[in-house]
Amino acid sequence: VPVTVRFSNFAGVPTVPDTDTLASPRGMAIRFKLPDGTDSDLVAHSFNGFPTPTTDDLRQLLIAIAGSGPQAAKPTALDRYLDAHPIAKTFLTTQKGPPVSYATLPYFGVNSFKFTNAAGASRFARYQIIPVAGEQLLDKDQVASAGPNYLIEEIGKRVAAAPVRFKLVAQLAEGGDKIDDPSIAWPDTHKTIDLGEIVIDRPVANNDAEQRALLFLPTALPAGIEPADPMLTARSEAYPISFSRRHGSQ
């Protein structure tokens, strides 16, 4: 199945250097071009978890961030929010350092899906994308010497030298797991099912224009896979709005 992959940084601000703490977690989005002509999208990031359990909580976090600029009185709205929400504080303060490459990080689809087979049996699962090259982070000296756009430069050279490979797996839910709470990571001891291998073997012809034209929708799913977390629906409703604003349509 042909795929298109987009890597990204967290902040959504193009001027944030790749070495900045605001750039993590990193993102990996995959579009599968299915045989019937439709697309299916998978969106993941490099932290196994999410800062909030619901979209309402996420809204409150974003409001707190917006009201906590450099001139805000202490404690800021964000300080107060994080004091009351330890999971969000952990998310914002325990990110990994800059990676050697986008190809040397694992990525996690933190929202759950319901998978149903032809016999009607269903299981809940979350996606994980595991780098065949293993996880590799920069050391302090490498961070100090890295350029602001080193990741996009590195991945281009890496793909030109040899295909980049990831394992795609599904981590199965077990009894007691929070199916609709992406802020709670499931234990690493849970069984995983190998779904296949993602192979990136060439860049697109016009990378800058092509990546700006991509809109990934996590509810674009094939038959047999359904959203099991209401946040997925909210994300698919919000992403087209941000997409249109980036392109000046709104």
Q: Which residues make up each language-model segment?
A:
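Active-site-adjacent core segments of small-molecule enzymes
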Residues: 1-250
